[in-house]
Amino acid sequence: MSQNSLRLVEDKSVDKSKALEAALSQIERSFGKGSIMKLGSNENVVEIETVSTGSLSLDIALGIGGLPKGRIVEIYGPESSGKTTLALQTIAEAQKKGGICAFVDAEHALDPVYARKLGVDLQNLLISQPDTGEQALEITDTLVRSGAIDVLVVDSVAALTPRAEIEGEMGDSLPGLQARLMSQALRKLTASISKSNTMVIFINQIRMKIGVMFGSPETTTGGNALKFYASVRLDIRRIGAVKEREEVVGNQTRVKVVKNKMAPPFKQVEFDIMYGEGVSKTGELVDLGVKAGIVEKSGAWFSYNSQRLGQGRENAKLFLRDNPDLAREIELSLRQNAGLIADRFLQNGGPDADDGEAAAE
């Protein structure tokens, strides 16, 4: 009895494998070779290409060393919090590796002088200032489908005004128009973004929901589609000012990884964004180095491998800026211990009430 049962199972397994082979060959005949495959047979799927954000601590918090290529990323926050700065720093890092980048400036507010200060190569940056939301998303779609773009930034979702709204009268009520536009565009874009390995960064603004009694009243513009399609969502906030004597020279910034499909989410980091310079890389090296025990702090003095960096954080930053080889050595050591730093020293913000569902996607 047991032998008959065993034979029956074996026959079924043979039938299953033959049926699977027939189904696979039929799919390949209909849709082309490579339309279906075993995941392990394609090595390119396993390796996730990344682009640095320009912030070492944020790269570590993201868990994969930067923002993922072939994915949609959303950066949102209040006004003047550093959203465009972070996107431009990502473009600058991609260009350093020879990548081709594009900037769809729906807000018509890109400052080329500031972008150059952040390290962006303006000669090789493609820029478009579209008149309507449809035009902006059509340009985005065409560039993504070309397969030649590495990083594309759309600034911002709130400025993607539907054509019907522009052609209508001031004060016309057109509910849900922008949300429908974004939903349709993302359905169309998502497959070509993956195939072309293009990173598309959407910058978004914050609005307040009226009548919310419990949880956060904040929401982002453009409906819910972007929350679902985005692989990474970053919430960026200005939490204070960086001063030299009485003069304000930068912003203290907090970034929370609200959603992350590539690694554990909810990591939270803080760094300085200096005016006319961008993310203070030397400041991050000092702060992270002390947390990880790579840079020693004794009283007000900072030292690395028995070499004094300076008295006080600002002097240590200046020393590292003047000694780039030493700064690179500390950065390399921090990146090699990225997993340990992420687990032990980066804050875990936890899900917010309004972002918990999206973050779990």
From Swiss-Prot:
A single GO BP: SOS response
Domain of life: Bacteria
Annotated positions binding ATP: G77, P78, E79, S80, S81, G82, K83, T84
Family from the record: Belongs to the RecA family.
Entry keyword annotation includes Nucleotide-binding: yes
Keyword list, A-Z: ATP-binding, Cytoplasm, DNA damage, DNA recombination, DNA repair, DNA-binding, Nucleotide-binding, SOS response
Pfam families with a match to the protein in the record: RecA, RecA_C
GO-annotated molecular function: ATP binding; ATP hydrolysis activity; ATP-dependent DNA damage sensor activity; damaged DNA binding; single-stranded DNA binding
GO cellular component, one term: cytosol
Known role: Can catalyze the hydrolysis of ATP in the presence of single-stranded DNA, the ATP-dependent uptake of single-stranded DNA by duplex DNA, and the ATP-dependent hybridization of homologous single-stranded DNAs. It interacts with LexA causing its activation and leading to its autocatalytic cleavage.
Protein name: Protein RecA
Compartments (UniProt record): Cytoplasm
Species annotation: Rhizobium rhizogenes (strain K84 / ATCC BAA-868)
Keyword DNA damage belongs to the record: yes
Signal peptide (residue range): none
Gene3D superfamilies: P-loop containing nucleotide triphosphate hydrolases
